[in-house]
């Protein structure tokens, strides 16, 4: 199915070649009633051929206004925020990832006058390089004689594939506003081509050299990358960020309102850092030098696929030997506080009664039931116990002195009696042992005497 716009274009080309003067008059007559219809078709970019355009949710209609291509506008006369450029539908914004070239015919469609997209694009290029004499005819007084510089210097992809938008170089003043809207968009798309279409988020292209339609998004253009309105990674900061830092902070190499490009250059040498990449507005600082630095100069820089060094991935932990210091004192490596031991608990654990004192209190060292205890020792023991009972419950130095004297007297008598008794016991034990030895010797001698007599008798011969 051929759209109404394409049919009108083909019919216009044929009629201009046959009857140039008559076509100029007919074109002037049809120019005013078809002005609004052609502007809407040029803004909508021929969405009738695209089956995907029918499924688009909503397309914001064109509203004529002040042409604004600054940082706050989108080039369509609608003054919106530059950061919200993706809020429109896919069929309206050429830089949207859902945008598909509407001039390309659907699959399986063939026309006699319309060739393949490659032939069509090459035909458009040849027409721009060698314009036909029909295009160089002198315009009428009602027509615009001076096309904008964007038509002469920046041929857009729409001009390559839309004969209507390419050949209508002589416009009336009423048509100039809608034409400049398309030219602003085309100029933005043309300037995006050296940077791999950053608004569509493309890091690579399948056919970068053979793709004349650079405005295609991430679906037909085989392009993919990070989502839009996101700054490039940290390792990709460098000279192409522009004088005002990355992102839409200021007019970068794309001009006002244009999206910032993808990083097409290698990262700068770490040793040659300076105020250039920083910018006057204070952009993010360049990455620090890599870990592998030679003594005489920088070593090989980090490649794009290599992960960043450890010092770029977050805050470093202190060395293992030095624990971190928290607001309440030193902390261990697990994040908890290092608690100092309580000295009171240590004293309670370490402190204990001596084993000697405990044995003296538990075991009575001076029992009275022993055989060496005499009546005198028992009387001294009773006096000592009496004074000890009087000292319990109150403190008396004089009574305590008497207790110590009585205690020393009892201990001396008790130990002397015990030693005397042990000596006597030892003497008796020795005497018993000696007596037992004598008895054994006597018994052994007595038993040996009869044996000797019997032996003597045995040596005497019988008569």
From Swiss-Prot:
Keywords: DNA-binding, Nucleus, Repeat. GO terms for molecular function: DNA binding. InterPro entries: TRAMP_AT-DNA-binding. Residues 87-142 are annotated as: 7 X approximate tandem repeats. Residues 225-270, 282-291 have a biased composition (Pro residues). Residues 397-416 bind DNA. GO terms for cellular component: nucleus. Residues 430-441 have a biased composition (Basic and acidic residues). Residues 1-13, 85-94, 194-214 have a biased composition (Polar residues). Residues 1-304, 426-463 are annotated as: Disordered. It comes from the Eukaryota. The keyword Iron does not apply. GO terms for biological process: dorsal/ventral pattern formation; follicle cell of egg chamber development; intracellular mRNA localization; negative regulation of translation; oogenesis; pole plasm mRNA localization; protein localization. Residues 14-50, 142-193 have a biased composition (Low complexity). Interacts (via N-terminus) with sqd; the interaction is direct and may be involved in localization of sqd to the oocyte during oogenesis. May be involved in localization of sqd to the oocyte during oogenesis. PANTHER family: AGAP013096-PA, ZINC FINGER CCHC DOMAIN-CONTAINING PROTEIN 7. This is DNA-binding protein K10. The lineage of its organism: Eukaryota, Metazoa, Ecdysozoa, Arthropoda, Hexapoda.
């Amino acid at each position: 199915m051929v759209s109404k716009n394409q049919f009108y274009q083909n019919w216009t080309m044929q009629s201009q070649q046959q009857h140039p003067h008559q076509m100029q008059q007919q074109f002037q007559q049809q120019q005013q009633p078809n002005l609004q219809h052609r502007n809407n078709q040029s803004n909508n970019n021929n969405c009738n051929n695209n089956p995907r355009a029918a499924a688009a949710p909503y397309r914001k209609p064109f509203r004529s206004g002040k042409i604004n291509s600054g940082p706050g506008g989108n080039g369509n006369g609608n003054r919106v925020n530059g950061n919200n450029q993706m809020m429109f539908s896919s069929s309206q914004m050429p830089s949207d990832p859902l945008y598909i070239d509407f001039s390309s015919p659907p699959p399986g469609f063939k026309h006699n006058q319309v060739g393949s997209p490659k032939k069509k694009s090459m035909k458009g290029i040849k027409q721009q390089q060698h314009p036909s004499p029909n295009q160089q005819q002198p315009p009428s007084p009602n027509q615009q004689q001076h096309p904008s510089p964007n038509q002469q210097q920046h041929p857009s992809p729409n001009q390559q594939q839309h004969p209507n938008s390419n050949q209508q170089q002589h416009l009336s003043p009423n048509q100039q506003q809608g034409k400049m809207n398309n030219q602003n968009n085309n100029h933005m798309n043309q300037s995006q081509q050296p940077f791999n279409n950053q608004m569509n988020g493309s890091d690579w292209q399948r056919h970068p050299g053979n793709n004349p339609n650079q405005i295609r998004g991430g679906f037909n253009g085989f392009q993919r990358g990070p989502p839009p309105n996101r700054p490039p990674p940290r390792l990709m900061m460098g000279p192409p960020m522009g004088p005002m830092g990355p992102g839409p902070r200021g007019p970068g190499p794309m001009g006002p309102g244009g999206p910032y490009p993808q990083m097409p250059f290698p990262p700068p040498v770490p040793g040659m850092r300076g105020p250039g990449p920083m910018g006057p507005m204070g952009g993010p600082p360049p990455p620090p030098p890599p870990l592998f630095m030679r003594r005489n100069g920088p070593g090989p820089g980090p490649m794009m696929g290599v992960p960043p060094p450890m010092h770029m991935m977050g805050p470093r932990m202190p060395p293992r030997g030095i624990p971190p210091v928290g607001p309440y004192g030193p902390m261990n490596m697990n994040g908890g506080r290092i608690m100092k031991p309580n000295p009171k608990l240590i004293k309670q654990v370490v402190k204990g009664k001596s084993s000697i004192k405990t044995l003296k209190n538990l075991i009575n060292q001076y029992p009275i039931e022993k055989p060496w205890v005499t009546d005198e020792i028992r009387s001294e023991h009773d006096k000592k116990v009496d004074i000890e009972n009087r000292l319990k419950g109150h403190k008396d130095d004089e009574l305590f002195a008497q207790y110590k004297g009585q205690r020393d007297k009892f201990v001396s008598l008790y130990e002397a009696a015990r030693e005397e008794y042990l000596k006597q016991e030892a003497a008796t034990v020795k005497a018993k042992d000696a007596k037992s030895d004598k008895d054994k010797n006597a018994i052994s001698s007595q038993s040996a005497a009869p044996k000797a007599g019997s032996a003597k008798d045995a040596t005497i011969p019988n008569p």
